[in-house]
Amino acid sequence: NNVTPDQNGTTDENGQPDDTTVDENGVNDENGVNDENGIPDDDTSAEKEFVAGYEKATEDVFRNIPESAINSAKNKLHIAYFHSSHGSRVITGMQGLKNYKDGDDTLYDFTTNGTPVAGKLDIYDEYEGGNDLSVKEVVEGNGYSQWYNETVAFLAEAGNSDINVLMWSWCNPDGHNHQKYIDDMEKLITDYPDITFVFMTGHPNGDGESETENSAYQAHKLIRKHCEDNDRFLIDYWDIETHGMEGIYYPNANDNGVSGSTEFYKAWQTSHPGEFFENSCAHTDEDQELTCNRKAYAAWWIWARIAEEK
């Protein structure tokens, strides 16, 4: 037999030198050859993702979410979402999506009153003026933010015992204590291990990568880094709204798909007729649809990923 000896002059039972690293099918992985799953054993490219930024907020990514993953989210998740007008972009986008293409009305159906219905994603949608992280950041007597205390009270109610996903949105993120937001979120994560708390950044204000303390950009940087470092789920409003559909970065964008004199979302719509859906998106021009379209795509990506972890 023509076998290759290892450094000790012996071979294993398969005729392979003992100093090679071989998977169970006899395929070397450490040298860049894929195993039976197509992923090298020492490769990190398959690490789980937790952040829904601009790269996830596209129809291509959305349509590639397996139907089984969507159904898993509908079967497993009971979501509570607290927000005011800017936060409504998630729900508005999800509602508009149902009228987009054949089958979307069924596959991506959801409730908003917190009453579970078979075949629909269960969401308790708490939408009212001032019901957001920006307004309710005041620190109360126990040392926690108002929104935190309201969350604890909400979860203590017997009728909310099934809630296993919860998130709050910002209104204008500028000028607020974003580290306190992170700290209070982490306290909730510690105290309610069976609930997935989803972080959010706020919309851009057209002031670019402002170095001003607690600007929208600084909030984005701080919150995103925390989520990336700690495997926390995040819907990154700032990231989504400062990127065009082709991935071009517009750091000076506002919350309406406009950077200076460039209406990059409307321009994309003009050149891509039929590739977006209508919705009444808060704080945008009536005919600018992509801001809420992208929130729907990002949200469904998040829901599917959370269900995968449940």
Language model features with spans:
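Second-shell loop/turn segments in exported
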Residues: 77-81, 170-175, 208-213, 285-291
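Substrate-gating cap/lid alpha-helix
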Residues: 204-246
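Ser/Thr/Gly/Pro-rich low-complexity, disordered linker/stalk segments of secreted
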Residues: 1-46
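Extracytoplasmic/secreted envelope proteins and their assembly/folding machinery
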Residues: 91-95, 152, 167, 178-186, ...
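Histidine-centered active-site loop/cap adjacent to the catalytic His
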Residues: 255-310
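N-terminal carbohydrate-binding/catalytic regions of secreted carbohydrate-active enzymes
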Residues: 51-156, 294, 298-300, 304-306
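Oxyanion-hole/transition-state-stabilizing segment in secreted/luminal serine hydrolases
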Residues: 142-182, 203-205
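Loop/turn elements at helix/coil->beta-strand transitions in domains of secreted/extracellular proteins
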Residues: 75-78, 103-106, 160-166, 190-198, ...
